[in-house]
A protein has these predicted regions:
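Non-catalytic beta/alpha edge segments that cap or flank active sites
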Residues: 1-153
Length: 153
């Protein structure tokens, strides 16, 4: 089981790569249900070079709430049952709902640093986002630091 640490998930890059598509799916669904933008920063700053991670931030650039942390942990670890799922499970977001998201200027911001595994993790996150709808709005900010993504976002 992968655990949520300070602001996100960090471990060996291969584990992060394995859960990246689920992270994209989960965050796209959060944008849909919460009607707010989120940021995803791919970095493991001070960790070993083989590690990587994803930091999740709310639309104000702050750490997400504990209920969202729990949701993300349960989502990436496949721990949902009908009794504990906080949102209606979905994979597809309808075009009408995408238009509402776009009209409210909501999107996912994805930033990543210079770690070798970061672009591959980003691509898998995007794959998860686009599984919900191929028109889901997102922006990639390559080669940024975490503070830069906070500022952009």
């Amino acid at each position: 089981m992968i655990k949520y640490g300070t602001s996100g998930f960090r471990t060996h890059h291969s584990v992060i790569l394995d859960i990246s598509e689920k992270i994209g799916l989960a965050l796209a669904q959060l944008v849909y249900y919460k009607k707010e933008s989120f940021g995803i920063m791919i970095t493991a700053s001070h960790n070993h070079h083989e590690d990587n991670g994803v930091k999740i931030m709310d639309e104000n650039g702050n750490m997400v709430t504990e209920d969202i942390e729990r949701y993300l942990v349960q989502y990436v670890n496949d721990q949902f049952t009908n009794d504990n799922m906080p949102y209606e499970p979905l994979i597809k977001i309808f075009n009408e709902d995408i238009q509402i998201i776009k009209n409210k200027n909501l999107k996912l911001h994805i930033g990543y640093d210079s770690r070798q595994s970061s672009p591959d993790i980003c691509e898998k996150i995007i794959k998860g986002i686009l599984r919900t709808n191929d028109q889901f709005p997102y922006i990639v900010h390559p080669l940024v630091t975490t503070p830069e993504l906070h500022f952009i976002f």
